Every structure is written in structure tokens, then in C-alpha cells.
Amino acid sequence: SDVYKRQARTCGELLRPVTLELGGKSAAILLDDVDLAANIEGLFQATLLNNGQTCVANTRILVPRSRYQETIDTFATLMSGAVIGDPLDPQTQVGPLVSDTHRTRVEKFIAGSQEQGARLVTGGSRPAQLDTGWFVEPTLFADVDPASTLGQEEVFGPVLAMMPYDTIEEAIAIANSTKYGLAGTIWTADEARGQDIARQIQSGTVGVNYYMLDPVAPFGGIKASGLGREFGPEGLASCQQLQTIYLATT
């Protein structure tokens, strides 16, 4: 974020327009009527795509307390059984991180989350079967404080934070409680209800039972997640300079 702030300052000094797509700490909100079995693959993609190394990763999972343990168990089974390995192998579900330096950063998040009281459910280590490569096991924390470091900061790795909620108003408040506003999802059997909740999320893009960017629709963030839009007519408009020509009518 500091780098992008410097870029924005430089563009301001030069009076140059700029589009900035920055980080995110997006939330997947599961409603009480969600069909976990039907949606778990979509949730896996939304939360752990590219090993969590995507700006739109929904790395906070907000779950109604009545479905909390069930959801923890479902995710733990999926994540602990994920195939880790060569990203060129079609069977691989979780590949390496981008560098050794970044893996060290992710591991510091994991250690710090335990120190701050989050409950480690699965993962948290380097996979024992892989002695080369910058791998980290898919890691799930439960009982994460929304105000903690893991609840607020972008990890950019395969580390998920699960949090219970008691009312949908509380879930919306938690989802909106970070400095970011890039993405998010709502998971429910009632699509109309999901759309209503999506409109209350302070985020540039929100999916209902699905998340995938579409180049015909504008993409971008609000708050600390960026300025401007990519894709769609709005993205093209940012590359244009308008000119008005006036003609006399007499």
C-alpha cells in the first residue's frame, strides 16, 4: 500500500490520471440456509484460488453460529486432503508461494495468529513430503477475532480465518470492518436474499454463490483497495480523453 500511495502522489504531482488495484481482505458470508455440499468447490475456489495469492481471495469466512462446527469440519476435511505439489501437474490443487521471502512472511502470520489466540484447525506447516519448493500447507484458523491481525491484514497465502456470527447485521458489520473493499461473496439457497445482502457490503465486487471476474463488467476496489476501474466500459473510459467541439448555430 505504501508503494501505491507513492505512485498516486507522483501521478498527482504530474497531473496524471491513475488506476490502482490494491489489496483486499474479502469475506465469504455463509447464510444459515447454505448447502455446503453443493457449494464447497465454489468456496474452495473463492477462498484459495492460486494458493490464496490473489487480491480477491475471500480469506475471511463468516458462518452462522448454528452451522459453525459443521463448516469448520467441512473445510478442514477439504483443506487437509488438498493435493499439494507441482503447479504444472493437473492433479495439483495447491502449489507453491511466489518466493522464499514471501513464504517466511506467511509463516509469520501463522505464528502470530496463534499467539493472538486464534485456534489452528489444520495446516500451519510446510508439507513434509515436499523437500523443495516454497510450499505452505492450506491453513485454517477458527475463532479468529475480527479485530486481530489475521482478521484485518492481507496474508496473500493459503491461510483462512473462520469467524462465527449471530445475526446477519453482525456478519455485514464484520465484513465491512477492514480498511479494504475489493471483493466478497454471499452463499445462500435464496438468491434474492443474497443480492440484498451483497448490496450492503462495502466492496467493489460481490458474488452470490459464485465469484469470477468478467471482462465485460467493471472491476476495482473502494477504500484502501484502490482507485478507478478495470474492464467493462468504465475501464475503457479511463483510457480516453474527451474533447468537446462547439459550433455556432447562426
Regions from the PLM with identified roles:
Residues D2-D145, V208:
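ALDH superfamily catalytic-core signature
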Residues I29, T77, V83, V94, ...:
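Conserved C-terminal structural/oligomerization subdomain of aldehyde/semialdehyde dehydrogenase
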